[in-house]
Amino acid sequence: MLDILKNNWSDAQIVDVSYQKGTLLLALKDYQNTIHKYLFENVIALSFENYLNEDISEIHSSFWKEENDTICQIDILSAWTNKEIVSFSFFTH
């Protein structure tokens, strides 16, 4: 299981999304104001809306096979609108 999926992220916020050359750095701040940073490599798709200071309701994941590769998609939902504020897909190892 991915580390990001092990926590309950309700009342957390996205504080940074940085993308460069197929690598995504995602920083989340939990309700105790602790910053958690996650690095994802081999990112093949990324979309986001205005996410700063937006509370998270939950994080969804899905996995599927494409030829010989496994792909994971992560969707982060807004607590206010329940819509995706960040979504990305990447090849897993």
Regions found by a protein language model. Name each.
Residues 1-93:
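Surface-exposed, interaction-prone regions used to assemble/regulate multi-protein complexes
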